[in-house]
Amino acid sequence: MEATSTRTPQEVFQHHAEVLVAGDIDGIVSDYADDAIFITPSGILRGKDGVRKAFEGLLGDLPNADWEVPTTLFEDDVLLIEWKATAAKTKAEDGIDTFVFRDGLIRVQTVRYTLTPVD
């Protein structure tokens, strides 16, 4: 992988999506700044340890999920996505995240989704 400071926000997000689908927590965490801020309706998590905790929860909620990202809107170093994920027993159909990128890493992310049982 190229040096993080030379990656565009689009390249960072592409890598982020690949490692998320693979369930690679270390790969996910590597895309975040040391001082990252991760905001959810449940609270604010900080740093790489906070990011790790957040994604352990997300991947625990949606293990081995099929992911869809129908909307990606970039503006400079900011991204908004809408997403869906379906696992064997649970799904999220209303996921929405925002990202702020800095120096080839994710500096801030907000996440919101509703977990429901699969019909």
Feature annotation, model-predicted:
Residues 43:
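Flexible loop/hinge segments that line or gate small-molecule binding clefts
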Residues 11, 50-53:
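A general alpha-helical scaffold signature found inside nucleotide-binding enzyme cores
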